[in-house]
Swiss-Prot record:
Domain PpiC: 139-245
Entry annotated with the keyword Signal: yes
Protein name per UniProt: Foldase protein PrsA
Lipid modification (N-palmitoyl cysteine), residues: 21
Length: 325
């Protein structure tokens, strides 16, 4: 989940430094990391250069990883994670290409696997701490399909139509699917310019309230099961939306719940920071350095600060989906 990834920083060089302060060193912060005739480089020198916030972020990441792994290791199947990674490797054209992509991001395959495990632990934490009733799940989700006719943002764009032609085409398709709603998937596969959903008969799966842009969402949640919308305009183009029959609701319920929890946390980061605080209290986490404690409480565990970061990162616009959860 994106929000949690913003909070949990990667454990990189600073983690190695913190390791030097631990089992392989004495309690003094003046441990020598590198010696030379010109002078030594000590742990204290590097920590001063790095800054308290970076050290706090990395320290918190390490301790949280340990605590989450201890609490939820029996609830996360690493075989499922391995299967997911195999699928991703295939999508990238093989293991070598996938590892090359990770290397460009400063990660090894083992690092990536650990990150996915941490994400799975975080999801378990939120399932424990964030309440979502069956009624909420029903009221805030709809199984959805759509057909998209894209509008060119500029004349040189290879994909899409002019606004006028896109609207005319969408209106023509809308009349066709309104007459033959059972052929929606067939028509979506042929006409939709959203290639990823067109391959699945236009299916977007279960859409959660707050996940899509307002105009799309308002039209969708007015529909009864099996109904088709009028033409809906978004920044992407013109959509025809269908509320699909939810024959698989019970089997998909846990996935829908997870999506809804993520959407809740995206809107209210305090749910996540409170969950972290409860977990840290349960495991008697004790900050030995007052400055590090303050840095963690003022940034990582401050929901207002997280909200500010979210707003800064979302200023560039987000297309059809609002949060990208």
């Amino acid at each position: 989940m994106k929000l949690m990834n913003k909070i949990i920083v990667p454990v990189t060089a600073s983690a190695l430094l913190l390791g030097a302060c631990g089992s392989n060193a004495t309690e003094s912060k003046d441990n020598t990391l590198i010696s030379s005739k010109a002078g030594d480089v000590k742990v204290a020198d590097v920590m001063k250069k790095m800054g308290k916030e970076q050290i706090a972020n990395t320290s918190f990441s390490i301790v949280l990883n340990k605590v989450l792994a201890d609490k939820y290791k029996d609830k996360v199947d690493t075989k499922d994670i391995d299967k997911d990674i195999k699928k991703e490797e295939k999508q990238y054209g093989g293991k070598d290409q996938f590892e090359s992509m990770l290397k460009q991001q400063g990660m090894s395959l083992d690092d990536y696997k650990e990150q996915k495990k941490l994400s799975a632990y975080q999801k378990q934490l939120l399932l424990d701490k964030v309440n979502v009733s069956d009624k909420e799940i029903k009221e805030n989700s709809k199984k959805t399909s759509h057909i998209l006719i894209k509008v060119k943002s500029k004349s040189s764009d290879k994909e899409g139509l002019s606004d006028k032609k896109a609207k005319e085409k969408a209106e023509k398709i809308q009349k066709e699917v309104e007459k033959n709603p059972n052929k929606f998937g067939e028509i979506a596969k042929k006409e939709s310019m959203d290639s990823s959903s067109a391959k699945k008969d236009g299916s977007l799966g279960y859409v959660i309230k707050g996940q899509m842009v307002d105009s799309f969402e308002k039209a969708l949640f007015k529909l009864k099961e099996g109904e088709v919308s009028k033409v809906v305009k978004t920044d992407y183009g013109y959509h025809i939306i269908k509320a699909d029959k939810e024959t698989d609701f019970n089997s998909e319920k846990s996935n829908i719940k997870q999506k809804l929890i993520e959407e809740k946390v995206q809107k209210k980061p305090k749910l996540l920071t409170d969950a972290y605080k409860e977990l840290l209290k349960e495991y008697k986490v004790d900050y030995k350095d007052r400055d590090i404690k303050k840095a963690i409480e003022d940034s990582i565990l401050d929901p207002d600060k997280i909200k500010q970061q979210q707003q800064q990162q979302s200023q560039g616009g987000s297309g059809l989906t609002n949060s990208g959860s």
